[in-house]
Amino acid sequence: MKSALLLLSYGSPERIEDLDEYLKNIFNGKPVPESVREENLRKYEMFGGRSPSNRIIESIARKLHEKIGDDMDVILAYKHWNPSIEEAVKGLGSYDNIVAIPLFSFYSQNVKDSYLNPLESALRRYGFSPRLEFVNGLANSDLFLPMWANIISEDASEDSFYLFDAHSLPAPDREEDYLFWLRYSTYKISQILGLSRSDFGFQGGHLGWLGPSIYDVLNRIDASKITVIPISFLYDHLEILYDLDYEFRKAVEAKGMHYRRVRMPNDSAMMVNMIERAARSAITHLSGEKINGSIIGQPRIADTDNGR
């Protein structure tokens, strides 16, 4: 039986010259508003013309190959860059088992719509019918909370307010599980580390999306320091380096507060181990009885209701 681990992520251009093609992919071929193009051009120019995300994900893939390469091939695919999900699927015809893991912390319908649906559609178009497990969110792993607790504790400060940050999503009525995992993770990590002052907020949202925004939280707290924990993300990219470390930092410092952000898991040993464990667990599900249907990650509320 031949198996593959398909690592899925958003993707980013390798060169600033590729930005227009990248934005065209995001807008599904529709005209890109000039204001959006200029904003993204400014961001990429600030960071040398590229995001660090692709290199981090490639490093994760290499390290996973060293650990599980004898059992499954590790394949990369991006939602908005190359190789695309469609391109990756072209090479999956010889595989009996496929474990697909989008590199996100929390279960969400948005991830399902954006990654699982295109993956299944592409498999059907090519006439492939492997056994497929889709790991929707890595917060279900027993390594997730210890990983973040370890990162946060590296430079903990009793006089800091801890802001757990997540990417906002549309259609809040469809994202109860996403909100559950954010609340649960905030609660459990604060409990583990004894953080007396903490809350969560969202970034990148629009009217009617999940809230409150991190700016709303900032405006109602009184502290000399704020520590940001981008817990819905797993690796560095421009939404962290620009939106948080540049834009949000300015708002924090304008209130006379000190801004600090914890490091990201990136390609650390705990991160790689967490993905490896999720992949091996999914292969076990494929070879035996499935748990929670074909989508792993959805919370079993009876097991974790005390975190609501």
From Swiss-Prot:
Q: Chief localization class?
A: cytoplasm
Q: Which Gene3D superfamilies match?
A: 3.40.50.1400
One GO term of the biological process aspect: heme biosynthetic process
- Pathway(s) the chain acts in: Porphyrin-containing compound metabolism; protoheme biosynthesis; protoheme from protoporphyrin-IX: step 1/1
Q: Gene Ontology terms, cellular component aspect?
A: cytoplasm
KW Zinc (keyword) present: no
Q: Which domain of life is it from?
A: Archaea
- Tell whether Lyase is among the UniProt keywords: yes
What's the catalysed reaction? Answer: heme b + 2 H(+) = protoporphyrin IX + Fe(2+)
Q: Which UniProt keywords apply?
A: Cytoplasm, Heme biosynthesis, Iron, Lyase, Metal-binding, Porphyrin biosynthesis
Binding residue positions for Fe cation: H167, E239
Question: CDD domains annotated for this entry?
Answer: Ferrochelatase_C, Ferrochelatase_N
Q: Where in the cell is it found?
A: Cytoplasm
For molecular function, the Gene Ontology terms on record are:
ferrochelatase activity; metal ion binding
Q: Under which EC number(s) is this enzyme classified?
A: 4.98.1.1
UniProt lists the family membership as follows:
Belongs to the ferrochelatase family.
Q: Cross-referenced PANTHER family, in alphabetical order?
A: FERROCHELATASE, FERROCHELATASE, MITOCHONDRIAL
Function text? Catalyzes the ferrous insertion into protoporphyrin IX.
Protein's name according to its UniProt entry: Ferrochelatase
Q: Which organism is it from?
A: Thermoplasma acidophilum (strain ATCC 25905 / DSM 1728 / JCM 9062 / NBRC 15155 / AMRC-C165)
Q: Specify the taxonomic lineage.
A: Archaea, Methanobacteriati, Thermoplasmatota, Thermoplasmata, Thermoplasmatales
Question: Which gene is this protein's source?
Answer: hemH
